[in-house]
């Protein structure tokens, strides 16, 4: 009897350990939300292809070693979406970009036969508001509380805003009256109204997050001021191709 008692205790302990090891795994988090989202908050990066359709671009690309494509570049932005209806969001956005390019005169050199060099900076910051319309239902209600988001939701939208811009050239320049070389800074900055249209798709990747791809065309132009006499307003329009991530905002329910 004394020999069987330790063996029995070992068997009981082993059975208890096996029972713990075979306990069911924890349940995964639910794949639904408690009610419709109240909005979204997102960040994105874009590639801007400027239209460069005004005479200022014609002048600097003709006289300097610049091309219109030199004014294309990356943009960063953020968006806040506020849900108005099951398919419509009010969008508030901010975009910023800056391009700095070095150049020299194509047809002139200085007295030492060295390049006449300068730097051109173009900076834009756009504050916008608009409406985003989903082309399909963004989700479905299950019961009284649960809401299941769709995986893919295409959308379109439009809006307007205000764009702050700065154009700055600094370095050495040629006086076309006597062909002398001088050092100077030319600058213009201000605000201009803007308008835009856009379309894209939201792709759900997490319970509360979407990856967003969109294309947006923006119209804007700004007066250059006295440093560029007799020039038309500078063209600030262009196409932005964007990718970003949006996080769902909802009240605690």
Task: Write out the residue ranges for each language-model feature.
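Extracellular/periplasm-exposed beta-strand and loop segments of Gram-negative cell-envelope proteins
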Residues: 50-71, 96-127, 163-192, 220-238
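Positively charged n-region of N-terminal signal peptides that target proteins for export
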Residues: 1-4
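Short glycine/proline- and aromatic-enriched beta-strand/turn motifs that initiate or cap beta-hairpins
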Residues: 19-82, 167, 242-253
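Bacterial N-terminal signal peptides
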Residues: 6-14
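Outer-envelope beta-barrel architecture signal
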Residues: 33-41, 74, 86-88, 123-125, ...
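Gram-negative (and chloroplast) outer-membrane scaffold detector with strong preference
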Residues: 45-47, 81-174, 241-251
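Internal, hydrophobic beta-strand segments that form the core of beta-sheet-rich folds
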Residues: 214-217
